[in-house]
């Protein structure tokens, strides 16, 4: 069926499909002429500045951008969401690495795309971003789902400090 008829609240998507959604949105904006396209691009820049990395949305002096973001949401971004049925609260991205820029775009238009991480042989989901203040950071796979424990080990099984590459080892109850 047509996504506008179904009016979903949540969308599960692989990054490649989300990229196509973005291309279609941008093509639709482009068709409306250079003035609309410039306004849309400016609105994105303002929303990007306000949202920053998602985790620090509206912090510091950026709170002053909130009225402008709300205006652009009402006159532009709401129409983008209507193209998806108007009810989408968030996307869940999985199956491949989700580009932070793609997350930034969908967050700006009011359809946050949440990244998760999982292994079918371990458990379907190991970590995930979620909605809420300070719970969503672009380019991150979020917090570890409880009661799981994650460690990064070197090739000899020694635990590695944060930021050092190694093998991901997961333990659950």
Q: Can you name each region flagged by the protein language model?
A:
Residues 8-88:
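Alpha-helical "lid/cap" subdomains adjacent to substrate-binding clefts that gate access
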Residues 11, 68-173:
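Conserved AMP-binding/adenylate-forming
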């Amino acid at each position: 069926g047509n996504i506008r008829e179904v009016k979903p609240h949540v969308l599960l998507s692989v990054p490649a499909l989300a990229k196509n959604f973005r291309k279609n949105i941008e093509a639709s904006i482009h068709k409306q002429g250079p003035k609309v396209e410039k306004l849309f691009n400016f609105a994105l820049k303002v929303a990007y500045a306000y949202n920053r990395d998602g985790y620090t949305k509206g912090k510091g002096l950026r709170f002053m951008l909130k009225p402008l973001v709300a205006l652009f949401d009402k006159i532009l971004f709401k129409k983008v969401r209507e193209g998806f049925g108007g009810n989408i609260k968030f996307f869940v991205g999985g199956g491949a690495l989700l580009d932070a820029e793609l997350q930034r775009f969908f967050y700006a238009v009011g359809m946050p795309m949440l990244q998760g991480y999982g292994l079918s042989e371990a458990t379907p989901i190991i970590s995930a971003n979620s909605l809420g203040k300070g719970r969503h950071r672009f380019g991150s796979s979020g917090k570890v789902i409880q009661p799981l424990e994650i460690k990064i080990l070197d090739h000899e099984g020694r635990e590695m400090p944060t930021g050092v590459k190694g093998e991901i080892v997961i333990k659950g109850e």
